[in-house]
A protein has these predicted regions:
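Conserved "turn/edge" positions that cap or connect secondary-structure elements
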Residues: 1-186
Length: 186
């Protein structure tokens, strides 16, 4: 808490209550991502009570406004359809936030969020748009990292995503279309 310098719990439900454990063990470490401005945190959990209507029984990505406690689920379509697989793919894999928390990127095992299972998605938290950053079938992707503005996301892939490099895995960068202006006053 910036005002008091005290400790603040941010993994509470949208109603301010305790999250249930879902299918995860009580000792599971939740791997959070913090926005560069310190206002937003993203994390994954199988808890089914973080937001109303979470009935998919899968691991989902949630974003919390630290100042207000508002919680939103990022791993749904723009119209609210729940993923049919875990997001991110592995327990302990963390989502990535842009500096201002306007974009969250994550891997997904869901096949109904605009791409096949095993790809990387990005949610524009400003307008709710969900963008498929990769569209491979087979192989594995993960560990997305957002640029400061959210305009680019870099992630690893175990199969070639670019026809110029057949058969090669590696790191790939994708433009998200998110454009922001940044101003600093020193």
């Amino acid at each position: 808490d910036a005002a008091t310098g005290g400790l603040q719990r941010v993994s509470l439900t949208a109603g301010g209550g305790e999250r249930n454990q879902g299918t995860e063990s009580a000792s599971r470490v939740v791997a959070p991502a913090l926005s560069g401005d310190g206002r937003w945190v993203a994390f994954a959990t199988t808890a089914s009570n973080m937001v109303a209507g979470d009935t998919n029984g899968k691991q989902d990505v949630f974003v919390v406004n630290i100042a207000t406690g508002a919680v939103s689920r990022a791993s749904t379509t723009a119209s609210g359809v729940q993923g049919d697989g875990d997001s991110p793919i592995g327990q302990g894999e963390r989502p990535s936030l842009s500096y201002d928390g306007g974009l969250v990127a994550f891997s997904t095992a869901a096949g109904n969020l605009g791409t096949s299972p095993g790809n990387v998605l990005a949610r524009n938290l400003g307008n709710g748009a969900l963008l498929a950053l990769s569209s491979q079938s087979g192989g594995a992707v993960g560990a997305p990292v957002s640029s400061r503005t959210g305009a680019y996301v870099v992630f690893g892939a175990s199969t070639a995503l670019d026809a110029r490099y057949p058969g090669n895995s590696g790191l790939f960068s994708r433009f998200t279309g998110l454009q922001r202006a940044w101003w600093w006053i020193d």
